[in-house]
C-alpha cells in the first residue's frame, strides 16, 4: 500500500533536542511521499530551522508557565484556550491523517486540538523523565513512544529510542581509526556553550599536557570565543586547541574525537551511543526534574561513560578522568563499543511506522 498523499502534522520546538529528532522522522516520511507540516512557535528555533529543511510551518501563540510569576500563571488558561483554537484551525485546514508530538510549547495545545478533531495522536518523549506536556498528553494519546525504559509509569509506552540522523548511524558502523599518541578530546556545551567547561578546560589542558599529549576541539558557545581563546593562550595551550563558537559539522567532530566531554541532553546521549564514543557526562544541574542525570545513566550503567555532577566538578577530577583514558586506550575502545551496544539504530523508522499504521487505520 502506498503512503503517497498521507499527511502528518509534526509538533516540536524550543530546543534542538526536540526539533532534530522530529526532523529525522519528518524527512523519512517525506521520502515516502507524505505531506509534512509543522506546528511551532514563532520565537523559538523551529521558526528558523524547519523552513531550511523545506517544510511549511504554522505558529501558535503559547509559552511555558512553569516558574513564571502569578499574573502570567493566572492568564495562562486563557492563552492555552486561544492556542488550542489556533492549533485546531491549522488541523481543520491541513487535515492531517496523524499528528506527532515531540515536545516543546506547541505540542500541548496541538495535542489537545488533535484529540478534539478526532485525529490520531502519537507522542514521543526524548528524555528519561517526561516533560510536563507529554506527561499530560500521554493520557489522551493513541500511542506513546519513548527513548528510554521506565520513562512513563502511568501509561503503557513503547521504547523506540531517539531518532537521529542517518549520517551518525553510518559513522558508528565505520571501523575505528587507531588512536595516535595525542588524546583527542571533543568538548561540547550546547549552542550556548557550558560556562563550567569554558572556565575549567584551559587549566585542565595545561595540567594534563605536562603528562600526556592532548588535542582539544572546544565548542564554547555564542559570544564566548574571545574569552576562552585568551584563557587557553594564558595557559600556553593555544597550539593544540581548536576553539569554535559553534561546531556546524558534528559528524566530522565525532569522527575526529577519542572521547567527548559534554552535557547529557537526550539527543546527545543517543548520538554518543550511535557513533560509539566514550564520554564524560556533566548533566546540566538546572534541567527540569534533573532529567539529564537520568539520561546519562543509560551510558554510565553500560560502562560507556563517566558521570561527574557539576557540583563536584573541578580541574583535578577532569584531569584524573582524562589521564585514565589516555593511559588505557584498550578501555577507551571498549567504552566506545559498549556505547554502540546500547544504541537504538532504527528509532526513526519505528516512530514513522507507528504514524503510518495509525494513519492507515483512519
Swiss-Prot record:
This is UDP-N-acetylglucosamine--N-acetylmuramyl-(pentapeptide) pyrophosphoryl-undecaprenol N-acetylglucosamine transferase. Its main location: membrane. PANTHER family: GLYCOSYLTRANSFERASE, UDP-N-ACETYLGLUCOSAMINE--N-ACETYLMURAMYL-(PENTAPEPTIDE) PYROPHOSPHORYL-UNDECAPRENOL N-ACETYLGLUCOSAMINE TRANSFERASE 1. GO terms for biological process: carbohydrate metabolic process; cell division; cell wall organization; lipid glycosylation; peptidoglycan biosynthetic process; regulation of cell shape. It catalyses: di-trans,octa-cis-undecaprenyl diphospho-N-acetyl-alpha-D-muramoyl-L-alanyl-D-glutamyl-meso-2,6-diaminopimeloyl-D-alanyl-D-alanine + UDP-N-acetyl-alpha-D-glucosamine = di-trans,octa-cis-undecaprenyl diphospho-[N-acetyl-alpha-D-glucosaminyl-(1->4)]-N-acetyl-alpha-D-muramoyl-L-alanyl-D-glutamyl-meso-2,6-diaminopimeloyl-D-alanyl-D-alanine + UDP + H(+). UDP-N-acetyl-alpha-D-glucosamine binds at residues 15-17, 127, 165, 191, 247, 266-271, 292. Its EC number is 2.4.1.227. Cell wall formation. Catalyzes the transfer of a GlcNAc subunit on undecaprenyl-pyrophosphoryl-MurNAc-pentapeptide (lipid intermediate I) to form undecaprenyl-pyrophosphoryl-MurNAc-(pentapeptide)GlcNAc (lipid intermediate II). Pathway: Cell wall biogenesis; peptidoglycan biosynthesis. It is a peripheral membrane protein. InterPro entries: GlcNAc_MurG, Glyco_trans_28_C, GlycoTrans_28_N. It comes from Shewanella sp. (strain MR-4). Belongs to the glycosyltransferase 28 family. MurG subfamily. One of its GO terms (molecular function) is UDP-N-acetyl-D-glucosamine:N-acetylmuramoyl-L-alanyl-D-glutamyl-meso-2,6-diaminopimelyl-D-alanyl-D-alanine-diphosphoundecaprenol 4-beta-N-acetylglucosaminlytransferase activity. It comes from the Bacteria. One of its GO terms (cellular component) is plasma membrane. Keywords: Cell cycle, Cell division, Cell inner membrane, Cell membrane, Cell shape, Cell wall biogenesis/degradation, Glycosyltransferase, Membrane, Peptidoglycan synthesis, Transferase. It is found in: Cell inner membrane.
Amino acid at each position: 500500500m502506498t503512503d503517497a498523499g498521507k499527511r502528518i502534522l509534526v509538533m516540536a520546538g524550543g530546543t534542538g533536542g526536540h526539533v532534530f529528532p522530529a526532523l529525522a522522522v519528518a524527512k523519512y516520511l517525506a521520502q515516502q511521499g507524505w505531506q509534512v507540516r509543522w506546528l511551532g512557535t514563532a520565537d523559538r528555533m523551529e521558526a528558523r530551522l524547519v523552513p531550511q529543511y523545506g517544510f511549511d510551518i504554522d505558529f501558535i501563540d503559547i509559552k511555558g508557565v512553569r516558574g513564571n510569576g502569578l499574573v502570567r500563571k493566572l492568564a495562562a488558561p486563557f492563552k492555552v484556550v486561544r492556542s488550542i483554537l489556533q492549533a485546531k484551525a491549522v488541523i481543520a485546514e491541513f487535515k492531517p491523517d496523524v499528528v506527532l508530538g515531540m515536545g516543546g510549547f506547541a505540542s500541548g495545545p496541538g495535542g489537545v486540538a488533535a484529540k478534539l478533531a478526532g485525529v490520531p495522536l502519537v507522542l514521543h518523549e526524548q528524555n528519561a523523565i517526561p516533560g510536563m506536556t507529554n506527561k499530560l498528553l500521554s493520557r489522551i494519546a493513541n500511542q506513546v513512544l519513548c527513548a528510554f525504559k521506565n520513562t512513563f509509569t502511568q501509561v503503557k509506552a513503547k521504547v523506540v529510542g531517539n531518532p537521529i540522523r542517518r549520517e551518525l548511524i553510518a559513522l558508528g558502523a565505520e571501523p575505528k581509526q587507531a588512536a595516535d599518541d595525542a588524546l583527542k578530546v571533543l568538548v561540547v556545551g550546547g549552542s550556548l556553550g557550558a560556562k563550567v567547561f569554558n572556565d575549567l578546560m584551559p587549566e585542565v589542558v595545561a595540567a594534563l599536557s605536562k603528562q600526556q599529549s592532548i588535542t582539544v576541539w572546544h565548542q564554547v558557545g555564542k559570544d564566548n570565543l574571545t574569552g576562552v581563546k585568551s584563557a587557553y593562550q594564558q595557559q600556553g595551550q593555544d597550539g593544540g586547541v581548536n576553539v569554535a563558537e559553534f561546531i556546524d559539522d558534528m559528524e566530522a567532530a565525532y569522527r575526529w574525537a577519542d572521547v567527548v566531554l559534554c552535557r547529557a541532553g537526550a539527543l546527545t546521549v543517543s548520538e554518543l551511543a550511535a557513533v560509539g564514543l566514550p564520554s564524560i557526562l556533566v548533566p546540566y544541574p538546572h534541567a527540569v526534574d534533573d532529567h539529564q542525570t537520568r539520561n546519562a545513566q543509560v551510558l554510565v550503567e553500560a560502562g560507556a561513560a563517566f558521570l561527574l555532577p557539576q557540583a563536584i566538578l573541578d580541574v583535578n577530577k577532569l584531569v584524573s578522568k582524562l589521564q585514565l583514558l589516555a593511559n588505557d586506550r584498550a578501555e577507551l575502545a571498549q567504552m566506545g563499543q559498549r556505547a554502540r551496544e546500547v544504541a537504538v539504530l532504527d528509532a526513526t523508522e519505528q516512530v514513522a511506522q507507528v504514524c503510518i499504521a495509525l494513519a492507515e487505520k483512519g
